[in-house]
Amino acid sequence: MARLYLIRHGKPSATWGGNDDDPGLDETGQAQARAARDWLMALPAAERPTRVVSSPLRRCRETAEPTAQALGVDIEVDARVGEIPTPAALSLAERGPWLRKSFAGTWAEIEGDLDYDAWRREIAASLIGRGNTAVFSHYVATNAVVSELLGVPQVLAFRPDHASITVLETDGVTLTLVEKGREATTGVL
């Protein structure tokens, strides 16, 4: 079995409703990215990641950068581990209320342009072949994977904190949850 690490991005410099729809990390987020790197690099060699994958969004790429540099590898950008797709008809101002409503329900109940239950299965399936990999992603995408692996329909399986590291194992055929990452004490929205 190979280890896979699903890391939520560090604290961004802006939140929902701000002027920047793709913010980078603030100083706290940069420190969190370095702490994630240090944790990953302290693992035994057999468990340490050899690849780095990131969501296309800047906050994830910036969180991934210290780990990629320490490993001497390039960041592989993969949209499949990106942010939950917002329905096309929603404005930026409507996204927060849509997310809050989505968080309160199940994957099958999310209203939008696609089958969000299928979306969560696709994210988990995309990770099966990624052993020995650090994957830098988002709050909702991390919940998609965890809820799929636990077999629960709720959107919120847990509340991953910024730069928390969820540990998974894969044999190339199946994906297993080893340990959820550190949980946040504050809300996302």
Label for each model-derived stretch:
Residues 2-77, 105-109:
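Active-site-proximal alpha-helix that buttresses catalytic centers in soluble enzyme cores
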Residues 29-33, 116-119, 135:
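Conserved anionic group-binding/transfer micro-motifs
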Residues 34-41, 120-128:
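Generic structural signal for well-ordered alpha-helical scaffold segments
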Residues 66, 144, 148:
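Active-site signature of alpha/beta-hydrolase-fold catalytic machinery across serine-
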Residues 97-118:
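Short glycine/proline- and acidic residue-enriched helix-loop micro-motifs
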